[in-house]
């Protein structure tokens, strides 16, 4: 199939009117067409399918439930929203529950109509009790290398990101041991600039939901935010649901980190795509009202927004469209070392493609 006349996104952040060839047999982007099928994309943007590396659940289901059918329904919902690849993200739970959840990724079809599972984001239990957010305090503990090896094996070595608080005992050794096999993300942490700087020097390369569940950027104590901005290999997630982060801070984060290091995420929980009401997250009740999801004490408990809407929010907040697409596609793919496969329109990559109208509504999902 040949997609003609569309404004095709390029990794520079620009759009160019050109043809894009898809091998419909292999579902890969190709150099030459195998058939004469043509899709006229006149007036449409052509972008890669989005990649969400931090998403807990949707449509009443959560990855941590350990329910294969529920995870498959999450994958279907995400695909319908233009999110064609994702890292199901766990909560802080006992090892046996995490083991059961991680095993479910093998049961989700890698087929049309389902978002592709690119790996797992393990958020906890190696987090700070002081910055636990919606994580359950009784399950938190220091990094445990043996436990992580067991969980990695249970997942089929599919853990792509692990969030840790670098101030916890044993964090530096943990980072050094696993930095070559998984992205080490700093988050849910009270770490000072110096502690975070040492963690990045040891091999950490990612920040979990920048600004949330960490000390604010202070002019005398810049903390994780300042250390990450100073570290050229650190990439930073940011929740762009319009609730977690003020639009001005979104704009300034892109200025601080640059267009190549920002990653848009949803941090969506099970109430996403559902009616208002009471739901559950990590063993705790959560109230959803509109786009806001909170614990009963008012603590924000993940988002109720999908990544496509977060990308549209970013554009509304003043981020150029080409830059917002980059932050929702190739940057997250790069962070989990999958940028040749997903989040790109390069020849040989999966043909996960979105066609958008000028108002950024989805016209077609390939």
Language-model regions, residue ranges each:
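Conserved, mostly hydrophobic/aromatic
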Residues: 43, 122, 178, 207, ...
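Alpha-helical scaffold segments that flank or form the walls of functional sites
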Residues: 45, 53, 63-116, 139-154, ...
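Active-site core of metal-dependent hydrolases
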Residues: 153-274
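His/Asp/Glu-enriched, well-ordered alpha-helical/loop segment
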Residues: 227-236, 242, 254-266, 271-356
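N-terminal metal-binding scaffold of metallo-dependent hydrolase/deaminase domains
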Residues: 1-34, 364-365
């Amino acid at each position: 199939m040949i997609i003609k006349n569309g404004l095709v996104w390029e990794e520079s952040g620009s759009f160019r009117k050109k043809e894009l060839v898809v091998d419909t047999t292999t579902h890969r982007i190709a150099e030459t067409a195998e058939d004469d099928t043509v899709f006229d994309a006149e007036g449409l943007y052509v972008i890669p399918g989005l990649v969400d590396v931090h998403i807990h659940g949707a449509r009443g289901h959560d990855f941590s439930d350990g329910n294969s059918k529920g995870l498959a329904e999450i994958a279907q919902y995400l695909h319908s929203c233009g999110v064609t690849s994702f890292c199901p993200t766990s909560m802080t739970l006992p090892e046996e529950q995490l083991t059961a959840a991680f095993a479910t990724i093998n049961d989700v079809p890698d087929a049309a109509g389902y978002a592709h599972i690119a790996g797992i984001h393990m958020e906890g239990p190696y987090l700070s009790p002081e910055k636990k957010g919606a994580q359950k305090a009784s399950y938190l503990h220091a990094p445990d290398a043996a436990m992580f090896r067991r969980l990695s094996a249970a997942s089929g070595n599919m853990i792509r990101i692990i969030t840790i608080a670098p101030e916890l005992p044993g964090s530096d050794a943990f980072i050094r041991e696993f930095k070559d096999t998984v992205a080490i993300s700093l988050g849910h942490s009270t770490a000072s600039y110096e502690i975070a700087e040492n963690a990045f020097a040891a091999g950490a390369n990612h920040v979990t939901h920048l600004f949330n569940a960490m000390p604010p950027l202070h002019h005398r104590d810049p903390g994780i935010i300042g250390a990450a901005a100073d570290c050229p290999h650190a990439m930073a997630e940011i929740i762009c649901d319009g609730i977690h982060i003020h639009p001005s801070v979104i704009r300034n984060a892109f200025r601080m980190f640059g267009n190549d290091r920002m990653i848009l995420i949803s941090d969506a929980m099970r109430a996403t795509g559902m009616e208002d009401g009471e739901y559950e997250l990590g063993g705790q009740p959560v109230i959803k009202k509109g786009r806001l999801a909170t614990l009963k004490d008012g603590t924000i408990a993940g988002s109720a927004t999908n990544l496509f809407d977060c990308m549209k929010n970013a554009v509304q907040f003043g981020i150029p469209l080409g830059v917002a697409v980059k932050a929702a596609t190739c940057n997250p793919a790069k962070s989990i070392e999958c940028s040749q496969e997903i989040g790109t329109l390069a020849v040989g990559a999966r043909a996960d493609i979105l066609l958008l109208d000028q108002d950024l509504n989805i016209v077609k999902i390939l």
